[in-house]
Regions:
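Structural alpha/beta core scaffold segments of enzyme domains
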Residues: 1-196
């Protein structure tokens, strides 16, 4: 995608102390290994994304009603990076969001364009995605290829996890894309099991 870069590796991220984990695995009574492929997916909520933006010239204030799962971050990003206004000049309301499956947590161009345009035309502007819009523009779950290893003692207690994941980030990063296969993923791998 980017000809000026030497490879398509976006970043290499680690959590934990590799030498300590390797030592735990060397002493483990049992090590089990799993290769896992998580396919790319498209969330498909019944309720598509939608937004209504309105500018109030009297108070120099915007209101955005949007089907966002994360209205506070939308307000932060739009205030700081899109409209260049203080956060208190933008109210973001997320009423009945409907289904989302994570795809409505991102900041989308439609929200920014509607909000900006509402000031230009001095009228409220609304938009609702149709199914084709959703398939083409909603953030998708990127595929991951993972090798996971679990070190156990003789009684089956977890001693440690060692995981290597290659995550397809796509050509361009979305709002939360870097966090999903790294911090959000790695810190949840053990689930509810006691793992040192």
């Amino acid at each position: 995608v980017h000809d000026d870069l030497p490879s398509n590796l976006c970043y290499d991220w680690e959590i934990g102390v590799k030498d300590e984990v390797d030592a735990i695995f060397d002493k483990a009574d049992h090590v089990t290994k799993l290769d896992l492929i998580n396919n790319r997916l498209v969330a498909n909520p019944i309720e598509p994304r939608a937004a209504l933006a309105e500018y109030d010239p009297a108070g120099d204030h915007y209101t955005l009603h949007t089907t966002s799962q994360n209205p506070h971050v939308i307000r932060l990003l739009m205030g700081a990076f899109v409209l260049s206004i203080p956060e208190h000049k933008l109210r973001v309301v997320a009423p009945d969001v409907g289904g989302g499956f994570g795809t409505k947590i991102y900041h989308y161009a439609e929200e920014a364009i509607l909000t900006w345009a509402s000031k230009k035309v001095r009228r409220p502007i609304k938009w609702t995605a149709d199914r084709s819009d959703s398939f083409m523009t909603d953030a998708q779950g990127r595929d991951h290829v993972t090798t996971g290893e679990l070190a156990l003692d003789k009684d089956g207690h977890f001693l440690g996890l060692r995981v290597m994941t290659n995550a397809n980030m796509g050509g361009y990063l979305s709002t939360f894309a870097p966090a999903i296969p790294t911090y959000l993923y790695a810190t949840l791998l053990a689930g509810l099991y006691k793992t040192p």
